[in-house]
């Protein structure tokens, strides 16, 4: 889910892109799932540097290719390892100018602990005043935007706990896809949003989005497709208001070839297992 938030309170200097992203396995998306093939560096959790100027709520930190990944003390380090894997792989696949735009816009990611809510996240606290919706019940993740560049996700989804309300899909990939679109691509490729809109309107007119979450707007249309691309979306044999039969990259190619072609400009056709979630919708190890 993507919510346009009101303002950014985060001030930090732009960081440099980690050079490990330029390896062939990362840039070309060669098939494989091992850490060696992904070239993922060790995930070392530390305290956030003072230079980030973060709220005191955040006491854990990892740098992911120039993007801060943060949380309170309640989030286990294992969640950082899993989220770092996902985010490192995705950012290494991005065009350098897209990732650079995200870094300069101060994009960052926060992990909510299992027993924390959306409004516990400092940047999202103001949502407690929304009398139309209980955000702590509604959302276990929000996508970053230029106005509020923080993306949030939840421990139970990152680690694929059985109690996760979104157990059949990866919400971090969905929400970070919003940040890629609404921050990186909006800045680095000004025509991307219009091209995405054209794909969305065509798919909507064809009726293939009916009774699914994809039809909400072009932002959700994109984020759901990115989940498909990495084989981490939920699947239903018939549309149920949220999902349908399309939940993998292979199926997306048949379901919406125009959108597939657009995504192929930004993500490699990879079989990397970058999530605790698998396309069979079964919880599994890497």
Predicted regions: what they are:
Residues 1-10:
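Bacterial N-terminal signal peptides that target proteins for export
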Residues 19-20:
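C-terminal motif of bacterial Sec signal peptides marking the signal peptidase cleavage site
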Residues 23:
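Short, conserved catalytic or interaction motifs in soluble domains
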Residues 26-30:
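N-terminal export/targeting leaders of redox proteins
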Residues 31-37:
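Acidic/polar, low-complexity intrinsically disordered N-terminal segments immediately downstream
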Residues 38-43, 49-59, 64-67, 72, ...:
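Acidic/His-rich structured neighborhood in mature extracellular/periplasmic domains
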Residues 51-56, 70, 129-162, 196-286:
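Metalloprotease/metallohydrolase-associated module, dominated by Zn2+-dependent proteases
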């Amino acid at each position: 889910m993507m919510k346009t938030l009101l303002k950014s309170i985060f001030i930090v200097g732009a960081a440099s892109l980690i050079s490990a992203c330029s390896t062939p396995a990362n840039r070309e998306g060669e098939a494989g799932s091992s850490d060696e093939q992904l070239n993922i560096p060790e995930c070392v959790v530390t305290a956030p540097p003072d230079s980030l100027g973060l709220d005191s709520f955040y006491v854990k930190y990892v740098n992911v290719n120039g993007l801060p990944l943060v949380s309170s003390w309640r989030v286990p380090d294992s969640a950082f390892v899993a989220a770092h894997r996902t985010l490192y792989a995705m950012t290494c696949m991005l065009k350098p100018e897209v990732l650079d735009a995200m870094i300069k816009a101060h994009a960052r990611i926060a992990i909510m602990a299992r027993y924390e809510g959306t409004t516990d996240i400092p940047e999202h606290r103001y949502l407690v005043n929304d009398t139309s919706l209980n955000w702590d019940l509604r959302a276990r993740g929000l996508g970053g935007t230029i106005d509020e560049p923080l993306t949030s996700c939840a421990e139970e989804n990152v680690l694929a706990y059985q109690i996760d309300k979104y157990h059949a899909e990866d919400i971090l990939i969905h929400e970070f896809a919003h940040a890629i679109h609404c921050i990186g691509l909006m800045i680095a490729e000004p025509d991307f949003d219009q091209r995405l809109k054209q794909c969305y309107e065509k798919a909507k007119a064809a009726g293939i989005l009916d009774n699914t979450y994809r039809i909400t707007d072009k932002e959700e249309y994109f984020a759901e497709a990115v989940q498909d691309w990495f084989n981490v979306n939920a699947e239903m044999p018939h549309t149920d208001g949220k999902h349908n039969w399309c939940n993998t990259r292979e199926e997306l190619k048949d379901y919406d070839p125009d959108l597939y072609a657009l995504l192929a400009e930004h993500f490699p056709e990879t079989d990397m297992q970058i999530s605790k979630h698998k396309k069979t919708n079964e919880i599994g190890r890497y």
